[in-house]
Amino acid sequence: MSDEAWKQTLICESINDKIGYWEYLAVTDKRRRSRNKAQSSGAENYKKVLEEQQRIYTAGGMGYGPEMYQVISNPMRNQKRVNNIEGSKIFAAMNSGAPRIALDIQYVEEMNKRDSGELGNQMQYTISENFSAKSPFVLDFVNSPSKEFLEQWLSKSVGYYTGNYINQTILPDFSTKGIKEFYGKSANTIYISSNARDVLDGPLTADVIGICVTMGRKREALSAARRANIRAYRLPIHRYVKWKSGPQYLPFPNIMNVLREVYMNGGDWSRALHNNISKRHLVNADDDEQKKMQMLRRRAREEERRELTEAIMSATKG
């Protein structure tokens, strides 16, 4: 492990946290090695294709490649034009009356590195899919943590804010203010929480929709809503979806897609939910051989983790 990884390990308070962090490092390293292998294989394949194209070109044929024939890309498409189009859609959304989305990040700094990194990646996809939408929402980050942590989080996990030409589009703003302070007490504001008693149904009429950026394990969203004195609602998943397998958790890009579709279709939650929930959650795991194998592998990993925890605790006693 690197020096930085050892430092993070020492920061972890419990053995379970340490093991979780090591698992995160192992998964990250495996992905990196797979990516490097794919890139190496791709480079070798490209070299072979280029050699074949060079042979065709030398023989007087239509060989494509450097210093040979070239395919001309669409001259009207460039990153600046794409950024300007995305920014213009966000600007139009500011004046359309659509709900503003308040992404509450007050808990992110307290999380372990694995969870904060995962949520950062989800925020990246959330911003990307919002840009791609025909009718995007205006996104804002509220209850922003310390500047030092925020800069590191954006750089390592979220992206966008550290890229080129970010001045050409409209990215979500950051504020240390709470939701009501940021949007004003007169705004019709609601908060999404899977632990809320009330159910959100019908057309979206709120001015502001608060969404807590957490993994949802400790009822943080409901606590945040109560502290801010904002009424909390849960999505009507139980009313319209027969969730058959896996944890009932929607990633943030999916939540945003559901809200956007409901706003556009006038309140058809059933269609919006079914369009944005992975089909694997709608199939009974007992009827799916692949699910059975995944379940067995997961149980094996859990048993290995339990044995490792016991071994570490035994070795560190006394």
Swiss-Prot record:
GO biological process, one term: positive regulation of mitochondrial translation
GO cellular component, one term: mitochondrion
Residues annotated as domain SAM-dependent MTase TRM10-type: 86-284
Entry EC no(s): 2.1.1.-
A single GO molecular function term of this UniProt record: tRNA binding
Keywords attached to this entry: Methyltransferase, S-adenosyl-L-methionine, Transferase
Record's signal peptide: none
Coiled coil: none
PROSITE patterns for this protein: SAM_MT_TRM10
InterPro entries per the UniProt record, alphabetical: MT_TRM10-typ, MT_TRM10-typ_sf, tRNA_m1G_MeTrfase_euk
Disulfide topology: none
Similarity section: Belongs to the class IV-like SAM-binding methyltransferase superfamily. TRM10 family.
Protein's name according to its UniProt entry: Uncharacterized protein C56G2.3
Organism: Caenorhabditis elegans
